[in-house]
A protein has these predicted regions:
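Acidic-enriched catalytic cores of C-N bond-cleaving enzymes acting on peptides and small amides
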Residues: 125
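Short, surface-exposed loop or secondary-structure junction motifs
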Residues: 83, 130-298
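N-terminal secretory signal peptides that target proteins for export/translocation
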Residues: 1-7
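Solvent-exposed, acidic/flexible segments
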Residues: 37-44, 57-61, 95-102, 118, ...
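Bacterial N-terminal signal peptides
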Residues: 9-23
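Short, conserved catalytic-motif segment at the N-terminal edge
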Residues: 27-98, 120, 134-143
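Hydrophobic or amphipathic alpha-helical targeting/insertion segments
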Residues: 104-118
C-alpha cells in the first residue's frame, strides 16, 4: 500500500500539522516557577517583551513560546494573532504547519524500523525499492558543468565548454544506500533550487506537483538521472520522500498509517496529522510571508 504524494509532501510544504501545546507531544508537563529550576523570571519577561515588540513592528504576525527545564514548564506565552484578517488572537492550542521539520519525524520512522533489525543502514535502497535499481548519473550538473569519473570514490568536473557531454549519463560509482538518504548525499535533487539539467527534468516531469502515490513517485524518479554520485556531495533533495516509501516497503503499510499507529498514537500526539480535520480548522494558524502577505490555505 502507498500514500498519495500530494499528502506526504510534509517534506516541502503544507501537510504535517502540530499543535504547540505540551500534550501534542505526550502528557502535559507539570509547571514550576522559573527560579525553582535555575531560570530568571526577569529574563523570561525580556523574551516576552521582545516578541510583543516584534509583532508591533510587523516582524511577525503572531507566535507562541514554551520553555521547559528539568521536565517542568516555566514559560508559556502567546504573541500577536493567528489570523490577522479575522483578528483572531494567538492561542496555546493553535495548530501550525511545520513544513520541513517533518523531515526528522520521517527519519524517526526509518530508524524505528532500523532498531527492529529490518535493514542495515548501508543496504542499497534498491534492495527495498526496486524501482530505483537502475539509476544513472547525469554528466551535466550545475550550470552546464559536466562530471566524469576520476577515481573509485569521487567525481571531477569538466569545463562547461565540453558540449559533447551535455545530456549524457553514466553508471554511478556505487548505488545509493539508506544511510545516504538520511544524510542527503544520495545524489538526488529537488528540482526548484537549481537549474541543472536534472533540475530541469524534475520540473518538466512535474515530479513535486504530482498526486501520485509514493510508490508511483519513486517509479517516476527512477527514470531521472542522479545529479551526483552517491556519497560524494551533500545536496538538499527528495531523499526524505524516498524514506517515506522505504517505510511503506519495509513495514507493509501506508506511510501515514505507520506514523499514526507507531508514533503519534503511542505519544498521545492528538493534534498531529497530515490533514487538519474539519472540526479543528478554526485552530489552524495562517501563514504570512516576510512581506506580511497571507500565504497557503487550510
Amino acid at each position: 500500500m502507498s500514500t498519495p504524494l500530494r499528502i506526504v509532501k510534509i517534506y516541502l510544504s503544507i501537510v504535517l500539522l502540530v499543535s504547540a501545546v505540551p500534550n501534542a507531544f505526550g502528557r502535559e508537563l507539570p509547571t514550576a516557577q522559573p527560579s525553582r529550576v535555575g531560570m530568571s523570571t526577569e529574563r523570561l519577561q525580556r523574551l516576552t517583551d521582545h516578541m510583543h515588540q516584534a509583532v508591533e513592528e510587523g516582524v511577525m504576525v503572531g507566535g507562541l513560546g514554551l520553555i521547559a527545564r528539568n521536565g517542568r514548564v516555566v514559560y508559556r506565552e502567546t504573541y500577536g494573532q493567528s489570523d490577522r484578517e479575522a483578528a483572531k488572537p494567538m492561542a496555546m492550542d493553535n495548530i501550525f504547519r511545520i513544513y520541513s521539520m517533518s523531515k526528522p519525524i520521517t527519519s524517526v520512522a526509518v530508524m524505528m524500523l532500523y532498531e527492529e533489525g529490518r535493514f542495515f543502514l548501508n543496504d542499497p535502497i534498491a534492495r527495498y525499492i526496486p524501482e530505483l535499481a537502475n539509476l544513472v548519473v547525469a554528466t551535466s550538473t550545475a550550470d552546464g558543468q559536466t562530471t566524469a569519473v576520476s577515481d573509485g570514490t569521487t567525481s571531477s568536473t569538466l569545463g562547461e565548454g565540453d558540449e559533447s557531454k551535455q545530456g549524457q549519463t553514466r553508471k554511478p560509482l556505487r548505488q545509493p544506500t539508506i544511510r545516504d538518504l538520511l544524510s542527503h548525499v544520495a545524489g538526488f535533487t529537488y528540482g526548484f533550487f537549481g537549474n541543472t539539467e536534472v533540475d530541469k527534468q524534475y520540473r518538466a516531469e512535474q515530479l513535486m506537483q504530482s498526486d501520485d502515490t509514493l510508490e508511483q513517485f519513486v517509479t517516476q524518479l527512477g527514470e531521472i538521472p542522479l545529479q551526483y554520485d552517491p556519497g560524494t556531495r551533500w545536496h538538499y533533495s527528495v531523499s526524505v520522500d524516498i524514506q517515506g516509501r522505504l517505510v511503506e516497503a519495509v513495514a507493509g503499510m501506508r506511510f501515514g498509517e505507520f506514523l499514526e499507529t507507531r508514533l503519534f498514537e503511542p505519544l498521545d500526539m492528538k493534534d498531529t496529522s497530515f490533514i487538519v480535520p474539519q472540526d479543528k480548522l478554526d485552530r489552524l494558524a495562517q501563514i504570512y510571508s516576510p512581506e506580511g502577505t497571507q500565504e497557503g490555505s487550510s
